[in-house]
């Protein structure tokens, strides 16, 4: 590829909400992929985006599972509070998706799902039903076409 290809893409950082220093998400635009949202390590998505074609978004925990894990002694209360202040719950993820125009979205990829506090299958199925979009759960080796058109 030539040097001119560099100008065919844009990467725009945006602030997220996490307990780390200067957390960021990214809106990436490329002529082949269109608009791609990447948002993880945030308990809330403070921005909405136009022209999305593909989304990678954290869907870390289910509040009921998290609470049950505290009640049953699997995790301490302090960890529950940290999770709530630094990660996107299933319901907040769903709200963030619904706040955006999903008309042109081809893929939603759920990332950073907690093994102990989440339910990947329920998250995938619930978000697919609510959005009418193709939803994937990120896992090693997963390959997805991120073209801006589905074919």
Where do the language-model regions lie?
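Short, polar loop motifs at secondary-structure junctions
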Residues: 1, 42-44, 140
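Cap/insert and terminal regions of metallo-dependent hydrolase folds
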Residues: 50-141
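Short, small-residue-biased leader/transition segments that mark boundaries at the very start
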Residues: 2-7
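Long, positively charged, glycine-interspersed low-complexity recognition regions
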Residues: 141-147
């Amino acid at each position: 590829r030539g040097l001119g290809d560099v100008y065919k893409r844009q990467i725009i950082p945006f602030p997220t909400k996490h307990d780390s220093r200067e957390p960021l998400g990214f809106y990436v635009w490329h002529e082949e992929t269109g608009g791609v949202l990447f948002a993880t390590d945030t308990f809330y998505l403070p921005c909405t985006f136009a022209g999305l074609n593909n989304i990678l978004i954290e869907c870390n925990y289910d509040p009921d599972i998290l609470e049950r894990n505290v009640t049953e002694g699997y995790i301490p209360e302090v960890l529950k509070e940290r999770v709530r202040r630094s990660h996107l719950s299933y319901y907040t993820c769903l709200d963030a998706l619904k706040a955006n125009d999903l008309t042109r979205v081809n893929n939603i990829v759920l990332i950073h799902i907690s093994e102990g506090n989440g339910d990947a299958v329920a998250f995938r199925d619930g978000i697919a039903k609510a959005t009418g979009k193709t939803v994937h759960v990120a896992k090693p080796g997963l390959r997805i076409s991120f073209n801006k058109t589905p074919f």
